[in-house]
Structures are given as C-alpha cells and as structure tokens.
C-alpha cells in the first residue's frame, strides 16, 4: 500500500516529463525554424538546450546537424550597390553562379542588349557627324549677332540692361581693336577693311 502511494514534497521528474515540459514552452516562431523554408540554409542542432558535456558526448554530438533553409534575401539587398568589397565569403560562394554578380559586390548588367547597343552606336554617329558638319562661326559673325541683340534690348529702356550692354560693347570694341592688330600681321588687306567696316560706337545709339 505504501509503495503505491505518491511521495509527498518535491520529486525529480522523469526524462519524458522534461521533454514534455520543454515542448510546451516552445513558441510558434521556434517551431517554424524546424520546418524547412525553401530558399535559405542555416544549421540547426536537434537535442538538449544545454551544451554537451563529457557524459553526453556519446549520445549528443554537434556534428549531427540538420541543414535547413534560411532567408538570405535581406543580406543580398543590403550588399547591393556597394562599390567596395564588403561582401561576406559565404555570400560570394552563394552568388558565384549568378551572371549579374561581380566580385566587387556590385549587381549590374554585364552585357548590353543588341538593340540597345545598336541604338547607342547610331546616336553616337549622328552626334559626331553633326559636330563635324556644323559650321564654326568666326569672331566677326558673333559680333554682328551680338550687335543685333543689343539693338533690340536697347528698345526696352531698362537701366540695368543698358548698363550691362554698355560694358559688353566696350569689351567688344576692345577685343575688335586687338583682333584688327592681330589680323594685320597674318592676313591680306581685304579682310582688314572688312573688319574695320564693323559699326563702331558712333553708329550705335547713345546710352
């Protein structure tokens, strides 16, 4: 009769009771780690929560790990568009098979599409041709256009505009006189007469 009675006070629970208590304390988030998630790897050790000691080395070993999938997308996004080599070694091994992955950690397009390369070539040819065929204006046509613009702006009657134009015309006259002296040493007399025929300050309206 006494052996069938339950002893009073604290008793040491059995191994089965300990496993049951530990299983009840596991949260749903921890239970999700035991299920394989496609796309990611991480090592998880199934066994007691305590570290192995000399008594348990035969029954419990860290080498018997179960590999499960772990999300690596957050790490990949964090390493994106980085110019320096800050990627981890495991990440490099995981991404070595991707064609858009470069060793310096930059995700980029390695080759341009045929249509894109063709269009860029035609655009560059058009730009180079337009620059080559574009006539270069000499100093005399530029001064003539500037004089025409100045004559139109004089009609506005604004003092700041007139002041700026006065300074501009004085600088233009100074450059024109220097240009005449330069042309006299290198060009025939006909071009000198053409340069001297440019209207001076006497033919312009008074400021």
Swiss-Prot record:
Coiled coil: none
Main location: virion
Signal peptide (UniProt feature, chain positions): none
Keyword entries, A-Z: Virion
Compartments (UniProt record): Virion
Keyword Transferase: no
Source organism, top-level taxon: Viruses
A GO CC term attached to the entry: virion component
Note: The gene encoding this protein is included within the N gene (alternative ORF).
Protein family (similarity comment): Belongs to the coronaviruses I protein family.
The protein's name in its UniProt record: Protein I
Organism from which the protein derives: Murine coronavirus (strain JHM)
Lineage: Viruses, Riboviria, Orthornavirae, Pisuviricota, Pisoniviricetes
Underlying gene: I
